[in-house]
């Protein structure tokens, strides 16, 4: 809403056709240029922009690389997608396992950085703009945001308040971030495990919202892995509309073939199965959900 209002305040009558983020982003790029528009974007996004005047394709990924964006170059030209399986539809693409990426996966448990498990496919780096000209030359790469730059700026100008002021400032920023992400035309909720990360997000959602937050948790019949009691206690304290699904290890093991179909690449995190279950539970009630992933 802020970016749309800023564009309208410039005095130019804009031919809005709807209320989509994409339409606002295109008008922002036209008004401020690509880098200027990106500086005004918050949260996760990935985009491909064709500049008809310059005959140039730009691929852009959000600051932390939350949204996936893959690309491949070949005799067909350049293809890009948010899912690897979409690239498999290219008739001339013959997927082959990348042995170097497989080595990285076995070492780290994830496919790191810009690597891809399929040979020849690459990922746009987080916070980067890749530009391709009409001759399909190798991409020029520039960054509109780097974590190292932000950390260095923080070192040059450190926070000067005391501990209490630091806590208050952190709370203000988390609250603002949550508030921005609660602007939705569809029902939303949150994953709640009872840990610090998700509990903080839900507490902020409850503070800024007018209705009880719909929260979702997966329980486990194996007590050593069950956090549902903690989640339920947090939900009661905050006044949430809480939902719990209890699964046993046999149920989770049976899901392995199904879950594997949803991942484009190998993924060694055992939490993928409960995450799949809580996502499926959540989808029965709401369309969008916040989580505490990455909060620590």
State where each predicted segment sits.
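Short phosphate-binding loop-to-helix
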Residues: 272
